[in-house]
A protein has these predicted regions:
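Bacterial N-terminal signal peptides that target proteins for export
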Residues: 2-13
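Intrinsically disordered, low-complexity segments enriched in proline/serine/threonine
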Residues: 9, 61, 104, 416-418
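Bacterial N-terminal signal peptides
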Residues: 13-22
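Intrinsic structural disorder/low-complexity segments
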Residues: 13-14, 30, 268
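Generic structural signal for beta-strand residues in well-ordered domains
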Residues: 21, 54, 69, 149-151, ...
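The feature marks long extracellular or luminal low-complexity segments
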Residues: 24-136
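N-terminal catalytic or cofactor-binding beta/alpha core of small enzyme domains
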Residues: 133-419
Length: 420
């Protein structure tokens, strides 16, 4: 007696699919698997450049298989291995030509050996470069001229991050409830005037770094993510701004052993005066001098190193007769903090931001810093005001540094450089 059986549907489906794949010429399982065999340097090796500035030729590597053919889709990791510096991109996928590249901004120390490694798995290619110090009076620019650095030879570094006007279409506008996009009107022009007036009357030039992009595109006074909202090209400009600033600081340190960093801004607060930000809050500035000197506020300030090297007390440096505020007021520019206005009280006041924290001496190092928030009328409102303020700044900084700058004779405790 025969018993009828029903075919297994799953088995039939498998047989049909296998037949279709074979009939359609599916992938040949016997085809060889391509394996990465080498990363070859194409350009960007053994070049000379300027500290803090991108090399004229970017490092480029080409990924090749065991037959010497270029390989697309290989993930290449770029890493600085010597000299500091920065990269526009650290992880890059090779294109159809098998190539990957990154912009290499050399480290700030011209004496340091500069080196870079490109790696894909265990396969690597190494690059080297030599850096020279920025030349006083020379202008260096980043990609598309978005960031500009006019090198100096004085121990003064001035940045203007919020005065730019460029609005390139390739950069999206920064948006969000936490985003500030107000422009500090005429601070770019004021910074340029300061550089020229110093050159004419002080026997040298300060280092000037300018963001030419409007603040809707980038905020260089914020950490990277907030500054660029994750845009890669805006990130490149941010990296250039801080790389130029680090190079300027290093040049000042190498030439003079010390320096003063000024982050230049503009405010629209009701009281027309300079607001000098040392990273101390209005509440801290309201404390009596004795409390200010004893409570460790010095270590939280952007002038930590300068204060510890000065014969004056911390409170005196902030608002005494030889403070920046008092010296500005002697030149006709009302300021806070100062002798006449030791604290802002309940009035609006900017006490310093990301740049002052990063580039001042709160975390150590020989370069101290201050954020200058300039009122509009009488400071930023035209060429005559720019020149008058710049002339006053020549006098103020000369007197301030003479009174407080570190010297070999100083017996006060030095501050070691530490990472922020």
């Amino acid at each position: 007696m025969r018993i009828a059986t029903r075919p297994d549907r799953r088995l039939l489906t498998l047989i049909i699919v296998s037949a279709l794949v074979a009939g359609c010429g599916g992938e040949d399982a016997s085809a060889p698997i391509r394996r990465l065999a080498s990363l070859t340097r194409i350009s960007g090796d053994q070049l000379a450049g300027t500290a803090g500035v991108a090399l004229a030729e970017s490092p480029i590597v080409e990924a090749r298989d065991e037959h010497g053919a270029p390989m697309a889709g290989v993930s290449v990791r770029f890493t600085i291995t010597g000299g500091g510096g920065a990269l526009s991109d650290t992880s890059v996928m090779t294109g159809a030509d098998g190539r990957a590249s990154t912009a290499w901004l050399l480290g700030p120390d011209a004496a340091a050996a500069q080196s870079l490694r490109a790696a894909a798995g265990t396969i690597a290619a190494d690059f080297t470069a030599t850096a020279s110090a920025p030349q006083a009076g020379q202008t260096y620019v980043g990609r598309n001229g978005y960031i500009e650095y006019i090198a100096g030879d004085l121990p003064i570094i001035i940045t203007a991050p919020h005065g730019g006007a460029l609005e390139p279409a390739e950069l999206p506008d920064r948006t969000g409830v936490d985003v500030t996009t107000l422009r500090d009107t005429n601070t770019e022009e004021l910074a340029r005037t300061i550089g020229n007036v110093f050159a004419d009357h002080a026997g040298g030039r300060p280092h000037i770094i300018i963001v030419r992009l409007r603040r809707t595109k980038i905020d260089a006074n914020r950490e990277l993510v907030e500054a660029t909202k994750g845009n890669r090209l805006a990130g490149r400009a941010w990296i250039e701004f801080h790389s130029f600033t680090e190079a300027a600081k290093r040049a000042a340190m190498d030439q003079h052993g010390t320096g003063l960093y000024i982050d230049l801004h503009g405010h629209g607060h009701p009281i027309p005066r300079l607001e000098l930000g040392y990273l101390l809050t209005s509440g801290a500035l309201a404390l009596p001098d004795a409390t200010m000197d004893a409570a460790g506020h010095e270590d939280q300030s952007a002038i930590r190193t300068l204060s510890q090297a000065s014969p004056a007390s911390f409170a005196e440096i902030l608002r005494g007769p030889t403070s920046l505020g008092a010296l500005f007021e002697a030149e006709g520019f009302p300021s806070v903090p100062s002798v006449s206005s030791p604290s802002p009280g309940v009035a609006e006041y900017f006490n310093g931001g990301y740049n002052t924290d990063r580039h001042g001496s709160r975390h150590g190092g020989p370069i101290s810093g201050v954020q200058i928030e300039a009122n509009f009328t009488g400071v930023r409102d035209g060429q005559a005001s720019w020149e008058r303020f710049a002339g006053a700044l020549v006098t103020v900084i000369a007197e301030y540094m003479a009174a407080h700058a570190p010297s070999p004779a100083s017996t006060r405790r030095p501050v070691p450089a530490t990472a922020p």
